Amino acid sequence: MNAEFALKGQETKASLVNVMSDVARPNWLLKLLPSSKGQEQAPVEKLYYDVLEASRQPVFYLEYEVADTFDGRFDMLCLMMSLMMARLKKADSENKEFAQDLFDAMFRDVDLTLREMGAGDLGVGKRVKKMSEAFLGRLTAYDKGLVEGNASILAAAIARNVYRREEEADIDLRLAEQCLRLFARLEDVADADLYAGAPIFSQLVRTA
């Protein structure tokens, strides 16, 4: 996958702060995303929030031992976003503009999250740029394993980018195999449902 995405200077309501700012709280796994009832959201925002919720599922932090930290949660968001981006690439219409909009939604949220967490205006832009570059690197690293259905390739990328180490371990392969199962189920989701922002992905993770 060519990482042909660029940041845009737009603003939107943040919800990532609710994922990232409570990492020290003992009940973070039980905390739900804020309700958006009564607020009209664009389909791409709905899809982003669904990917975000998928990345928060307890199974990743308990069974797969992803670090319960800001970095760990961001790494899982990058992994789940990579699955969604790879799925969108396979859509019949291959709506590249929609994929760009999804990327924008993610990093508008990252920007506002960092501000909510107290980062100064001067530092936010640099951190957002660094995080967007990190995501694009992961997007490329994960794509080969996802597209080829190769758990070993995907596991090597997960070891480096989720567990932050060069040596591989059994848990890398377990998480890679889980991601491939999720990706296979995503392929069965209708393109129209994805473009409508249907909350399907997080449900797939919960029932996997």
Question: What are these model-derived regions, one by one?
Answer:
Residues 2-79, 83-208:
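Surface/interface-facing alpha-helical segments and adjacent flexible terminal/loop regions used
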